[in-house]
C-alpha cells in the first residue's frame, strides 16, 4: 500500500507541475524525456553495483516488445492529436483499461471476480465522465473521427499490451527490482533518443519560420532539475507498482490521479461529479 500511496502522490505532483510549466514556460519536451531516461538508467546501474552488489546483469531481450510498443504509442499520440481534438482523445483513450484486463487474462492467465469486473467498469466509466468537457462533443469531420477512433483503439491496444508485458517481464523471475528496471530502461532509452531526433526538425523549422519562437519565459535550470527529478522518482515508483502489484493497479492509480486533478481544478459539472463518484466507487469495490 505504501508503494501505491507514493505512486499516487508523485503522479499527482508531476501532473500539477507539468500543467503549470506548460502554461507559463517553453522547453524541449523530447530533450527532457531523454535526460530522464538516461538518469533512470544510470541510477539503476549505480543501484546494481552499490546496493545489490550485482556485477553481471544479462540483457533481457523480451523488453524489446515494450520498446516497440512504446514507440508506436508515442507516434500515434502525435498523429491522433493532429487528427481530432485533444478533449475527445483524452476521453476515448480511457477505454484502455478494458484492454489491460483482457491482456491480463490472456497473457498472465489472471482471473477476476464479478465484483472486480464491476469495479473496473465503474473506474473506466468514471474516467471517461471525468475527462469529458463541453468541447469534447464539438463537431468533427466524419472521416477524421472514424480514422481517429481506429487509431485510438490501436493505441489503447498497444499501450495496454505494453503495460501487461512489462508486468510479465518484471515478474517472470525472482530478480532484484533495480536490475529489472535497468533492463526495461535499457531498451526504452532507444525510443527516447529516437523521439528527441524526431523532435529536432520540428523545433528547427518553427524557429526558422518564426512562429515557434517562445512567447513565454524559457524554463529555468532550477525548474528543469525539479521536473527531471520528479519524473525520475515517478518512473521508478511506477516500475515498483508493476513488480509488487499489477498493471490493473497501475491503471487504477492513474484513475485516482485523474479524480484528484479534477477536484483540484474546481470545475464541477454533472458528468465530472458522476465520474468522480464512479471512480471512487470502483476503487472501493476493488479493495474490499
Each language-model region and where it sits:
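Polytopic endomembrane small-metabolite transporters, centered on the Drug/Metabolite Transporter
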Residues: 1-288
Amino acid at each position: 500500500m505504501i508503494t501505491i500511496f507514493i505512486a499516487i502522490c508523485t503522479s499527482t505532483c508531476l501532473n500539477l507541475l507539468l500543467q503549470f510549466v506548460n502554461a507559463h514556460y517553453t522547453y524541449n519536451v523530447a530533450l527532457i524525456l531523454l535526460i530522464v531516461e538516461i538518469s533512470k538508467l544510470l541510477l539503476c546501474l549505480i543501484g546494481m553495483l552499490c546496493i545489490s552488489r550485482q556485477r553481471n546483469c544479462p540483457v533481457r531481450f523480451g523488453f524489446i516488445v515494450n520498446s516497440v510498443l512504446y514507440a508506436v504509442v508515442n507516434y500515434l499520440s502525435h498523429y491522433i492529436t493532429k487528427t481530432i481534438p485533444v478533449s475527445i482523445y483524452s476521453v476515448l483513450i480511457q477505454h484502455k483499461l478494458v484492454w489491460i484486463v483482457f491482456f491480463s487474462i490472456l497473457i498472465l492467465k489472471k482471473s477476476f471476480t464479478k465484483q472486480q469486473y464491476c469495479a473496473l467498469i465503474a473506474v473506466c466509466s468514471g474516467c471517461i465522465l471525468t475527462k469529458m468537457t463541453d468541447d469534447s462533443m464539438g463537431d468533427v469531420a466524419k472521416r477524421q473521427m472514424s480514422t481517429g477512433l481506429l487509431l485510438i483503439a490501436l493505441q489503447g491496444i498497444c499501450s495496454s499490451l505494453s503495460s501487461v508485458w512489462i508486468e510479465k517481464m518484471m515478474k517472470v523471475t525472482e530478480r532484484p527490482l533495480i536490475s529489472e528496471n535497468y533492463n526495461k530502461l535499457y531498451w526504452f532509452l532507444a525510443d527516447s533518443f529516437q523521439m528527441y531526433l524526431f523532435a529536432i526538425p520540428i523545433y528547427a523549422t518553427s524557429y526558422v519560420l518564426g512562429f515557434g519562437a517562445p512567447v513565454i519565459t524559457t524554463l529555468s535550470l532550477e525548474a528543469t532539475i525539479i521536473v527531471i527529478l520528479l519524473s525520475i522518482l515517478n518512473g521508478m515508483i511506477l516500475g515498483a507498482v508493476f513488480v509488487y502489484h499489477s498493471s490493473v493497479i497501475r491503471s487504477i492509480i492513474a484513475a485516482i490521479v485523474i479524480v484528484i486533478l479534477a477536484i483540484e481544478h474546481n470545475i464541477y459539472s454533472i458528468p465530472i461529479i458522476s465520474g468522480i463518484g464512479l471512480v471512487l466507487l470502483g476503487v472501493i469495490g476493488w479493495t474490499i
